Curated annotation (Swiss-Prot):
Protein name: Isopentenyl-diphosphate delta-isomerase
Role played: Involved in the biosynthesis of isoprenoids. Catalyzes the 1,3-allylic rearrangement of the homoallylic substrate isopentenyl (IPP) to its allylic isomer, dimethylallyl diphosphate (DMAPP).
Requisite cofactors: FMN; NADPH; Mg(2+)
Enzyme category, top tier: isomerase
CDD domains for the chain: IDI-2_FMN
Subcellular location: Cytoplasm
Superkingdom per UniProt: Archaea
Amino acid sequence: MEEQTILRKFEHIKHCLTKNVEAHVTNGFEDVHLIHKSLPEIDKDEIDLSVKFLGRKFDYPIMITGMTGGTRKGEIAWRINRTLAQAAQELNIPLGLGSQRAMIEKPETWESYYVRDVAPDVFLVGNLGAPQFGRNAKKRYSVDEVLYAIEKIEADAIAIHMNPLQESIQPEGDTTFSGVLEALAEITSTIDYPVIAKETGAGVSKEVAVELEAVGVDAIDISGLGGTSWSAVEYYRTKDGEKRNLALKFWDWGIKTAISLAEVRWATNLPIIASGGMRDGITMAKALAMGASMVGIALPVLRPAAKGDVEGVIRIIKGYAEEIRNVMFLVGARNIKELRKVPLVITGFVREWLLQRIDLNSYLRARFKM
């Protein structure tokens, strides 16, 4: 099982780097419209992109979300995480790591997650999977594993990733999700670190968001449909014909990022990381205007990170930041707080969905609360 976990990490990285693993559908932000302001009444140079999130101040509202880990020192996951960490250190943005299950099963892989020597100041988020906390898990994790995952790598927070879609498709998937909320309640009430509930490409509904808020999580990474599809990744991994067919059918399963963001913002008071198909700064600005505290990216920086290209990662993120800044100038927003107050027009499929699921006018007011 332990060697299988490490092999799976290699395969996930390989397919994300070499195959088209993105959803065939959009993340929904084409239906979200910001209103151009011909007289912004601000100077572009005065725009401030800094944000506060989970008690820390960051220079940009962009987080590198968890991707990988679990290979040995000197191997690809080690190189990816160290490259991303150096970029995050330079930019003063938070960094998430990939699942640390491999580290728990094979402790010698811990160095592929350890980046403090190159990123002493980065807000670092560890990562464990929800099914390992299910009451029927083969080796059920407890608070002890959570603290080990955080403290061994000197992280500042922990993400518990919710990936039922991926697990249901994966040949060796764990679908033991009963009892996870109970486990989350114990974790949040016991540890002194922020806990982020993180989806993995299929989005979070308002109902699940309310449950997560009730058990005390500190933030939600909605990771909606429209970016990397983990059903697609598993499609390329499996050799089993039935599993491949299942993966193909569920390639585009989930809640679009824009929809998930609106639902979670309307239903809870939690900080939100909006990830899932964030491929340009205009989309990111829309997400921030819709009430996200941060936006999250992963796949766009994976390729330069795999090459050890720190400057390449920095260049991509600074490009996104400049695009966000330009949007803010064109809508007359001096800072992210003001961006959340600019007019929004929501049309098309996203509007139709939200009219059935939430009070749209109430939501448009609720986005001011963070």
